[in-house]
Amino acid sequence: MPLCLKINKKHGEQTRRILIENNLLNKDYKITSEGNYLYLPIKDVDEDILKSILNIEFELVDKELEEKKIIKKPSFREIISKKYRKEIDEGLISLSYDVVGDLVILQISDEVDEKIRKEIGELAYKLIPCKGVFRRKSEVKGEFRVRELEHLAGENRTLTIHKENGYRLWVDIAKVYFSPRLGGERARIMKKVSLNDVVVDMFAGVGPFSIACKNAKKIYAIDINPHAIELLKKNIKLNKLEHKIIPILSDVREVDVKGNRVIMNLPKFAHKFIDKALDIVEEGGVIHYYTIGKDFDKAIKLFEKKCDCEVLEKRIVKSYAPREYILALDFKINKK
């Protein structure tokens, strides 16, 4: 039985639109009604996220609903996996891609002929709901953590609005670092933040972690990229958080702030900033540390050398390279 949102009928259309906007409506089942109530099938989502986007009374229930009869068309991945099997097997074309707002970013090697790159871009444009398609021309690089992109199909623009976890974000995929694959990680942090927390987001970018911490008392959002801070300010206004989030354009090493919850989302270089994080965090506070590695041991030893701490939680966020992962560790700092 699908998970359903039980609401009063009078809120039906508005609620349906909000669920669609946030990609939470389960389209495999039909919406049904009984008496004064509607039952809207939804995807698995935390109740707190629903409360943050729906200003109405609701109940989460499991209910038998009629399945939609859908004639399934071949997906983008299915088509390219057949048409370009050789290039995929050689590691030149990846079946994975990112969706940021209404833009798609593919992973296709420079070694693939331009004509084929364009063909794949057009396929993505037709089969993935989007307005524009790009491919990565480089890895993330430089002080601002951005990558070169090549336009393949659709609209040739890089600015978009991305929606996740009940909030919206302006993102320019050519000028700032942003990973939609960390949406689940941001939802995890969102649940941990309390009303009295003072959060310091050391590498804030356009503010996805800062805005996820919206229930905190105060959030310092720091970044060295002026384009990121410009969009962060727009995102603060877009999500009506002017009274909570303080944007700071600076190298974090030059900023003098304190907090009881520190976010270090800079996996490749976070180890270089541990001393600064320990300077920022209050004793008894928590550091959310992101790094790249084969296991958790190296990160734990780094912290244990510098302070009295305990690991509250550790998890693999996603694969980074063969036998390497983006790792998340939550450290409670008992004494510095």
From Swiss-Prot:
Listed EC numbers: 2.1.1.228
InterPro entries, per the entry: MeTrfase_TRM5/TYW2, SAM-dependent_MTases_sf, TRM5-TYW2-like_MTfase, TRM5/TYW2-like_N, Trm5a/b_N
Keywords noted in UniProt: Cytoplasm, Methyltransferase, S-adenosyl-L-methionine, Transferase, tRNA processing
Any single Gene Ontology cellular-component annotation: cytoplasm
Catalytically driven reaction(s): guanosine(37) in tRNA + S-adenosyl-L-methionine = N(1)-methylguanosine(37) in tRNA + S-adenosyl-L-homocysteine + H(+)
UniProt-reported outcome of changing P267A: 1000-fold decrease in methyltransferase activity. No change in affinity for tRNA
Effect recorded for G207A: 33-fold decrease in methyltransferase activity and reduced affinity for tRNA
GO biological process, one term: tRNA methylation
Main location: cytoplasm
Effect in UniProt of substituting R145A: 16-fold decrease in methyltransferase activity. Lack of tRNA-binding
Outcome after substituting N265 to A/Q: 100-fold decrease in methyltransferase activity
Subcellular location: Cytoplasm
MF GO annotations: tRNA (guanine(37)-N1)-methyltransferase activity; tRNA methyltransferase activity
Positions annotated to bind S-adenosyl-L-methionine: R186, D223, I224, D251, V252, N265
EC class (word): transferase
Family: Belongs to the class I-like SAM-binding methyltransferase superfamily. TRM5/TYW2 family.
Subunit structure: Monomer.
Summary of the function given for this chain in its UniProt record: Specifically methylates the N1 position of guanosine-37 in various tRNAs.
Listed name of the protein: tRNA (guanine(37)-N(1))-methyltransferase Trm5b
Species, as recorded: Methanocaldococcus jannaschii (strain ATCC 43067 / DSM 2661 / JAL-1 / JCM 10045 / NBRC 100440)
